[in-house]
Regions:
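N-terminal beta-strand/alpha-helix entry module and adjacent surface
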Residues: 1-106, 111-195, 202
Length: 202
């Protein structure tokens, strides 16, 4: 993304999801979206991730590039917010280790189903832990494999009609996934490509 001109600054290998509209364009890197879709295990109800990346203003349009994600510990039964100060502190430590050059873009939830109404907790979490410019929110429901991308603006959560998935080498995200896998396996048995393939397997 270093050539001159708009097209030279955008990823070349992309896949469009839905219809793209408006002056804010969202690009989710493939390793990140795969991680969000496959992180939940059969015995879990929900996982929460903080999204990292960077933004570029190109020809009066704001482009969001999300190429990092760090899991945040949460309490499913927490009444006020989904995460707390302690989990946020741990996320910052992990992000400093694996994504030192990226900034917070927003967050994501992967959960089993949508029967539990979390709207109040989601909005409260957004207000308490994220700045107005950290407004991206992604949700994936594993039971029916549906997903949606939102922007929090003016106190509301607005669903986007479309976004892009892009494909690039992403060593930082691969290294983070390796760190998760090696909790269950010996480090010498795992490398970045192997871990990435495991997350991509359906």
């Amino acid at each position: 993304m270093a050539e001159q001109g708009k097209e030279g600054m955008l990823p070349k290998n992309i896949r469009q999801i839905g219809q793209i509209s408006g002056n804010q364009k969202i690009y989710l890197e493939d390793y990140v979206i795969t991680y969000l879709r496959q992180i939940l295990t059969p015995d879990e109800n929900m996982r929460v991730m903080i999204l990292y990346g960077h933004k570029e203003m190109i020809e009066d349009e704001l482009y969001w590039f999300v190429n990092g994600a760090v899991e945040a510990q949460h309490d499913f039964f927490m009444e006020k917010t989904i995460i707390d100060e302690e989990s946020w502190k741990k996320v910052n430590e992990m992000a400093g280790k694996f994504f030192p050059e990226l900034t917070v873009m927003g967050w994501a939830i992967t959960r089993e189903d949508s029967t539990e109404d979390l709207e109040e907790q989601i909005m409260r979490t957004q207000r308490q832990f994220f700045r107005p410019d950290q407004k991206l929110y992604f949700e994936y429901i594993t039971s029916d494999k549906t997903e949606a991308l939102y922007l929090h603006e003016k106190g509301k959560r607005n669903m986007l009609s479309g976004y892009y998935i892009y494909y690039e080498r992403n060593e930082c995200m691969q290294n983070y996934m390796v760190s998760l896998r090696t909790r269950e396996r010996h480090p010498e048995e795992m490398n970045a490509d192997h871990a990435a393939r495991q997350f991509r397997e359906v």
